[in-house]
Amino acid sequence: MPELPEVETIRRTLAPVLIGALVIGALRGEHPEDILLDPWPVFARRVRRHRIVALERRGKYLAARFEDGDRLVIHLGMTGELRLSHPATAPGKHCHLALVLRSLRPLPPSLVDQRQRFLLRYLDIRRFGRIALLDQAGWETFTARLGPEPLDPTLDPRALWSRLRERRTAIKAALLDQALLAGIGNIYADEALFQARLHPARRCQTLSLDEVERLLVALRTVLSAAIENAGTTIRDYRDGQGRAGSFQSRLQVYGKPAGTPCPRCGTGLARIRIAGRSSVFCPRCQPLH
């Protein structure tokens, strides 16, 4: 599933093309009803005649903001992909819908036709992604349910520690809760816990302030490095230009088979399940007690 670094990379690579473009229509694909919160006819009518003035991200959500304050909010699920395409290109498999846009500035002929039209296609093999049109009030209500982001410089470690002390869950499960911190998934939770030397099954209320400060530093370091490397491509993820990320070559523990030597101490890595997700860690570097 694309996490904060992947969605931020998509935002950065799509923004130069999308900002300023006018949505002039929508094309129905294979199964738009599995992706859209609105029925197709309602969505196709509502999305037309909107100009994109900003491309925003909140946690794992991408939002195209229109000039009237409405937003097209996209969650990519497990295998969602946004792909810029020339109108004459075939959609291919697993394309569920496309926006038809007109650019007000010149774009490469490989992307636009003679009328400066191009497509933004949504592809999704597993169809777990979601797309919704929200007005300003709906967007504010929706984002109010999300926690702060680890990269927010105003996030206070003491405030995070206070919130964690109220929880009796494992720290790994807490990190996956978007109401606590927005944008973290399985990849970067495992990587940050390894860097912070914290066992994924440690109970939140047992963490000291120093440990929470260390965890927040690790989260910021890992997420920033992942963004610098255009995200992590395990299988499906591509950025807004169709390119794979490269952070997968820098992963320390995520996805490693049990018994793989720890990159820090050489101890065999262990794998357990927490909150229904696989967690990989070093039993020596990340002791439970």
Curated annotation (Swiss-Prot):
GO terms for biological process: base-excision repair. InterPro entries: DNA_glyclase/AP_lyase_DNA-bd, DNA_glyclase_Znf_dom_DNA_BS, Formamido-pyr_DNA_Glyclase, FPG_cat, MutM-like_N-ter, Ribosomal_uS13-like_H2TH, Znf_DNA_glyclase/AP_lyase, Znf_FPG/IleRS. DNA binds at H94, R126, R167. Its cofactor is Zn(2+). Binds 1 zinc ion per subunit. Belongs to the FPG family. NCBIfam families: fpg, PRK01103.1. Monomer. Involved in base excision repair of DNA damaged by oxidation or by mutagenic agents. Acts as a DNA glycosylase that recognizes and removes damaged bases. Has a preference for oxidized purines, such as 7,8-dihydro-8-oxoguanine (8-oxoG). Has AP (apurinic/apyrimidinic) lyase activity and introduces nicks in the DNA strand. Cleaves the DNA backbone by beta-delta elimination to generate a single-strand break at the site of the removed base with both 3'- and 5'-phosphates. This is Formamidopyrimidine-DNA glycosylase. The lineage of its organism: Bacteria, Pseudomonadati, Thermomicrobiota, Thermomicrobia, Thermomicrobiales.
